[in-house]
């Protein structure tokens, strides 16, 4: 319900302010998948959700709950909040549970936004592979070409799914 309402309220202003095109929509599988995305700005997940009309579980940093409004929105969109200071086993278990239920998980494996636009990707944390292997889930790369700027088109590319089958036990 909340995602539907957000789409209605945000579609026109964001389509004008941040026109976005998504390439590779057909690469998305029907069932569970881990959407592994680079992280250019706070708009990344908003633009993806707005233009794909896809329901996903978002792995988000716990600090986002400090803003009551934003925390409320993310919680009701089904976000899993992770404490980046240590090994947050409960957040990892919640992500794995969502995947076992056939849901999609949207994750930023760098754990933070990449400020340097000349780089494609920052250092990736190890949790992504562990979650994919333990849940036998395909990984799709989602690449935000550049940081969104007002009235400049943004492109999002979705890669073909791949699995780490050689590591499945």
Task: Give the ranges of each region predicted by the language model.
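Short, basic, glycine/proline-bearing loop/turn elements
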Residues: 9-10, 76-82, 111-115
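Residue-level detector of anion-binding/catalytic polar loops
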Residues: 80, 104, 136-138
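Catalytic core of membrane glycerolipid acyltransferases/transacylases, capturing the structured
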Residues: 29-86, 94
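Catalytic-site beta-strand/loop segments enriched in glycine and acidic/polar residues
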Residues: 98-128
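A conditional alpha-helix N-cap/helix-loop micro-motif detector
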Residues: 85-89, 121
